Structure formats: structure tokens, C-alpha cells
Amino acid sequence: MTSSKNPTNDNSYFDAVLVGAGIMSSTLALLISEVLPDIKFLILEKLNAPGSESTGAFNNAGTGHAANCELNYTPLDEKGNLIIDKALSINRSFETSMSLWASLYEAGKIDIKKFLKFIPHISFVSGQDNISFLKKRFQKMTENPEFIDMEFSTSFDEISSWAPLITKDRNPSTQIAATRIDRGTDINFEALTKEYLSLVSLNKNVEIRYKTELVDLKKIDKKQWELEISSEGRKTSIRSGYVFLGAGGKTINYLQKSKIPEAKSYGGFPVSGKWLICEKKDLTEKHNSKVYGKADIGSPPMSVPHLDTRWIDNKKLLLYGPFAGFTTKFLKQSSYFDLFSSIKKNNIFSMLDVGFKNNDLINYLISQSLKNHNSRVENLKNMMPSANPSDWYLKNAGQRVQIIKKTEGGGSLKFGTEIVNSSDGSLSALLGASPGASTAVSIMVEVLEKSVLFLNDKHNLQKKINDLIYPELSVSENYSTFIKEIKKRNNSIFGFHP
């Protein structure tokens, strides 16, 4: 597809419009620019800089999600069998992201030092039942090449060597266990977004408009959308053959404005977050890992605590949390009316049903909102017994909007991401949250392949994407062999030595 589809060649028409300049839209923009360099597309961003909302370094929780240590991705079924399908899927998607970064870095197009650092990923538990679960998880996961390098230990001294702050002031007789994968990462997705858009902006067919907000959109004929946009109080209209809605929590509002039939099944449930942050060098230098615990029985998945080493603005920090809360806003910089404006005739009953069914979530959010500083630090002490309240301060994290989807019985609350596509491929929207950013490449490849942009030359464009992400590698049906080759190549390019 080329911009020749615009017969009048006027400045108000674009082959594609991407709403939002976070990690999702910037990833899609990068893919379009690399495999369809001749099409004319526009990126709209409400704020004055890219990656400032959900993608912001302090605003996203899973910075390097690969399912190495997140125990909620490997649940037990009703018979006590460990299910690792989701962990495998997330890990493979993350490796796809790593492969794209490796290709772009090798070609001199991005600087990985600005956004990627290798850091071990650790799962930590205490108590015999949790230790049994972690051992079962270790045994099951190491049967797969994705997790073959995982280590397991119940040795207090060995776990101390992995994460000394976890064991300091902890009774050595306490039953504890941990797994570790050295090849974990910390990813600054805000910095990565800026790398992507710096590269994309070199394409003369791409325009990025900041301080520009989508007001409304409607389908005006079979091949075009009309979008009303506002910039510093001035409203104008543009047209496009394809629209991607990647505006974080606000996507649900925009999707509803589109009036596509596929939008009628959805609602959103906003959740806010807060971090405990430590900048003290004597502590940050002693902790070099991301450590995930296990959620209490009956607690929602978002309650899983983690103590992370993070690098933000070239500074090493410790972040613990996130502690959840409730607000009716869908973004940090949006309106308290977001939730209310998203309630429609076709989703109100599913939203009410979710509220009635999820008392544990409601109670959890209330309890989290009522916590003071000392009670949050007491929670931290479950993972870091030596924590001192004076060493930590509180900072607001980003907004998440969990998906509410209509079902035959009412509604269901979904944790994760979901793509909504119009039947003709002219509009796509990304809803949901975790593991989002880490799997952005796989998600955006799927978005692109189902879009009208791929309509006329799908096979050739799919080959271009494979060549971009996996140069000099043949996509093999034997995934075990393929993943080993991918990891070997990526490790070599990144200079990671297991």
C-alpha cells in the first residue's frame, strides 16, 4: 500500500493515523516505517513528549517482563497441575522484542545502552506450601529451552548471595526458596519509545504532532475515517484509511466513539498505583535483581509484590510495589469523568456484574488506598526485613485500565492485553495492561498483519517483518531449535555471556 490511495494528495489525508505516542504506537510506527516506508502516516500525542503516560519510566510496573519470575503467570489448575502456557507465550513474545532490538542495534539504528540492562530475575517465597509450588514450577519450566538456565535453591546462604537485602535480618531458620535466571532485563520503555520515534522521524512520510488530542472519529465511507483533532484549542479534521488506537487507558473511550460493532462488548476498570522508592546508594548497590514474591491466597494478580533494581535517568534506584488504588481517571493526565463516560447501555450490566463478582478486588483496592507510609513499609519488610521507613519515599505510578468484557453470564474482568479489530481491518485498538510493553513487538506485528495496510501484499510483508526481526535465521517449525538460535544470536549482539 502506498500513499497513492490519496487521490487529491492533500495534507488532510493519511494512509494511517496512530493515536498515542507510547511504546505501542511507537513500535507500530517503527514496523510500518521499516516494511512500508512509502506510506504517509501521522502520530497524534496529547502531551508534549512521547512515552509520558503509561510508558513513562515510573509509570509502568513490568519493566522487562519475560515470565521468568512472575509467579501469577504459572497458576495451578483445579487438579493441582501447574499451567505454564502463559509464561511460555510471554517469554517467546519478549524474545521477539529482544530480536528486533538486536537487529536495529546491529544496524546502528538504536542505542541499547539507553534502555536495556541485564539484571537477574528472581522468584522468592517462604513457607513449605509455597516452596513446594516453586520447586514444581522450576521442574516444569526447565523442561523448556526458554527457561533451561533457571536455578533453584533453598539454601539461605546461596539466596543471600543472590539478593542480600532479602535475607538481611531474616531468621536463618526460616524456610525460604528462590529461583533465579541471570538473563533477565530492566527495560526503560520511555527511553526505548524515544529511540523508536527518533528513528521513525527520519522518514519524510511520517509526521508526529504533540499537544494534539483526538476528539472524535467516525467512518465516512468504506475506505476512510474522519478524525476530529484539537491542538491548543484549535479543532481540525483529518482523514485516514487506517486508525490505530494506542492511547493507554483512554483507548476504551476512543474505541467507543468509533461505534464499530466489536467495541460494544467492552468496558474498563481503572486502577492506580504507587511505588516505594529508595535512592540510598548503600542500599541500591547491594541489590542487583528483580525479585517477585507470591500473591496471598484470594488476592488479585496485580497484588504480587516485587522489589526491583531500576535505572531511570541514568540513576540506579530500588522500587517496591506497586501499591494499588482506585480512581475514575483512565490516565494520570486525564479526566475524573473517564470511567463514567465509558459506561454505555451495552456494557453497564457487564460492568455491574464484574463489580458484584469481584469483592476481593474491591476490598483489596480499599485496603491499599487506606495504607499509610509505615504500613507500606511493613509490607515491604515481608520481602526486605531490614527496611527502614526513612530510607523510602512514595511516588505515584501510572494508571491501568483492566478490561471488562461482556459474557453470556454478565461480564468478566480480564488481566492482560487484548486487540480489538474492526471487521474490515481499518481500525485496531489495544486494551488492557500487563504484560503489555514487554510483548509490544509481537502484539504490533499481529495488529499490522490484520490491518488493511497488509491487505494486498500480506505474504511479502510478513517476509519483510521476519527478515527485520530474525535476519539470517530461518523461522523453523522446531521451536526448541529456533529459540536456541535466537537466544544465541541476541546474546552475541548484546554482549551477554551466560
Curated annotation (Swiss-Prot):
GO term, biological process aspect, one: tricarboxylic acid cycle
Annotated gene: mqo
Enzyme class: oxidoreductase
Origin: domain of life: Bacteria
Pfam families (UniProt xref): Mqo (PF06039)
Species this protein is from: Prochlorococcus marinus (strain AS9601)
UniProt protein name: Probable malate:quinone oxidoreductase
A single GO molecular function term of this UniProt record: L-malate dehydrogenase (quinone) activity
Coiled-coil spans in chain: none
Family classification: Belongs to the MQO family.
Catalytic activity: (S)-malate + a quinone = a quinol + oxaloacetate
EC number(s) given by UniProt: 1.1.5.4
Biochemical pathway: Carbohydrate metabolism; tricarboxylic acid cycle; oxaloacetate from (S)-malate (quinone route): step 1/1
Swiss-Prot/TrEMBL cofactor(s): FAD
